[in-house]
């Protein structure tokens, strides 16, 4: 039995089986490359679901984390830490918002945004108590906690978890008329992924985000953009909302915000929204901790200084066009923006992901029939060409 096999056996024995990973153990990583305990080398085309946009172990981010670890790691929010204010300023200026509220995981940030929207609905908009509604979209993925599960349209995400939470409506993604019909006097917010990731890299129709913005303005409803997976350069723009040139009332960010080395997420909005929180009304012991802020400051610097959105746009266009040229009866569609690309098949994508692993390329199926390609944004054209060579070989 190999070391990898022993690790997988141990993991399966003691761990809950809430994931079905490919049978590979990653023990080392740098840039776009990872290794297993046996020394086999693989190219990472998933980026930990876009949490590693800056590449594995980016030296600037790692150094920032090490330097901070030598000073102070956690103070809780009972006291001030010396880099939280700096991080607040950087992320607020980047997003063009007045205020930020840090959490740890994407799901926590979604929960925070939903709480903010409900309290805003009662305290600012004047909706009758306990009547506020939030509209989401079929195919959405906003996390695994109870509120995101309650607004999901996937039966398996909800099975056995009832009773689900009330106050959510769902409409079809891309259908302006359905959204218009769903909005009423009790609508507090519309929660949308500018690109639906887990649903299979679903791109909205042109002008759809603008239509959402206009409807929200017309009815005094908050436009909440979940940019956890598609944001911070992944789509070829700093934020995926930039494709429609709209400005949401609320941003939710996570994943690459921590540079792949420390979890941090955030809700960003103007004072009118985030000032609904008062001391004691919401919090997180680890939210905005010194280690997370240090890693995030460096992670954001890397995104801007190395122009990762621009790299993603240029290389993503090239990669997508090359994928479209692969002639195979199983390939139904190639779609995406930047280095956020889905190859939809007429059959299950899992066997193809397993075959690509054997070729030294790591990716993961989503929505059963879609292969998601989302490499670190630092990838080179030469590395993409190597990936394309392996992909063509599998489809031959």
Curated annotation (Swiss-Prot):
Gene3D superfamilies in the record: Aspartate Aminotransferase, domain 1, Type I PLP-dependent aspartate aminotransferase-like (Major domain)
**Source taxon at top rank:** Bacteria
Reaction catalysed by this chain? a 2-oxocarboxylate + L-ornithine = L-glutamate 5-semialdehyde + an L-alpha-amino acid
Kindly list the cofactors needed: pyridoxal 5'-phosphate
Q: What class of enzyme is it?
A: transferase
Main subcellular localization, coarse class? Answer: cytoplasm
Q: Name one GO molecular function term.
A: identical protein binding
Q: What does this protein do?
A: Catalyzes the interconversion of ornithine to glutamate semialdehyde.
Family in the record = Belongs to the class-III pyridoxal-phosphate-dependent aminotransferase family. OAT subfamily.
Q: What is its EC number?
A: 2.6.1.13
Q: In the record, which positions carry N6-(pyridoxal phosphate)lysine?
A: 255
Its name, as the record gives it, is: Ornithine aminotransferase 2
- Pfam families linked: Aminotran_3 (PF00202)
Among SUPFAM superfamilies, the record links this protein to: PLP-dependent transferases (SSF53383)
The record's subcellular location field reads: Cytoplasm
Task: Report the GO terms under cellular component.
Answer: cytoplasm
Query: What does UniProt give as the signal peptide span?
Result: none
What pathway is this protein said to act in by its record?
Answer: Amino-acid biosynthesis; L-proline biosynthesis; L-glutamate 5-semialdehyde from L-ornithine: step 1/1
Q: Which GO terms describe its biological process?
A: L-proline biosynthetic process
Instruction: Name the UniProt key words of this record, in alphabetical order.
Output: Amino-acid biosynthesis, Aminotransferase, Cytoplasm, Proline biosynthesis, Pyridoxal phosphate, Transferase
Gene assigned in the entry: rocD2
């Amino acid at each position: 039995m190999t070391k990898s096999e022993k690790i997988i056996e141990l993991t399966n024995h003691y761990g809950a089986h809430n994931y079905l990973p490919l049978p590979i153990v990653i023990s080392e990583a740098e840039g776009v490359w990872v290794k297993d305990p046996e020394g086999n080398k693989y190219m990472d085309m998933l980026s930990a679901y876009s949490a590693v946009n800056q590449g594995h172990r980016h030296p600037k981010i790692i150094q920032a984390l090490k330097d901070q670890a030598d000073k102070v790691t956690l103070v809780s929010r009972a006291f001030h830490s010396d880099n939280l204010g700096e991080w607040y300023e950087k992320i607020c200026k980047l997003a063009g918002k007045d205020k930020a509220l840090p959490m740890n995981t994407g799901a926590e940030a979604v929960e925070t945004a939903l709480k903010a929207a409900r309290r805003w609905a009662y305290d600012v908009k004047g909706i009758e108590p306990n009547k506020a509604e939030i509209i989401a979209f079929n195919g959405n993925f906003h996390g695994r906690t109870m509120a995101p599960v309650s607004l999901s349209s996937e039966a398996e995400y909800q099975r056995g978890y009832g009773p689900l939470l009330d106050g959510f409506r769902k409409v079809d993604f891309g259908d302006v008329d359905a959204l218009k019909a769903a909005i009423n006097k009790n609508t507090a917010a519309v929660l949308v992924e500018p690109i639906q990731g887990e649903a299979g890299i679903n791109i909205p129709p042109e002008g759809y985000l603008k239509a959402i913005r206009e409807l929200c303005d017309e009815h005094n409803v908050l436009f909440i953009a979940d940019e956890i997976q598609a944001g911070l350069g992944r789509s070829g723009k700093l934020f995926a909302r930039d494709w429609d040139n709209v400005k949401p009332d609320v941003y939710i960010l996570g994943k690459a915000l921590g540079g792949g080395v420390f979890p941090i997420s955030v809700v960003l909005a103007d004072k009118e929204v985030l000032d609904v929180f008062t001391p004691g009304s919401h919090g997180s012991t680890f939210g905005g901790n010194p280690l997370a802020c240090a890693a995030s400051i460096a992670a954001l610097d890397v995104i801007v200084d190395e122009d990762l959105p621009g790299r993603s746009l240029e290389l993503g266009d090239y990669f997508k066009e090359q994928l479209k040229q692969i002639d195979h009866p199983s390939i139904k569609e190639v779609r995406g923006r930047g280095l956020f690309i889905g190859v939809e098949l007429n059959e299950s994508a899992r066997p193809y992901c397993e075959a690509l692993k054997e070729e030294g390329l790591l990716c993961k199926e989503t929505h059963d029939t879609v292969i998601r390609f989302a490499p670190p944004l630092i990838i080179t054209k030469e590395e993409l060409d190597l990936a394309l060579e392996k992909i063509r070989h599998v489809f031959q």
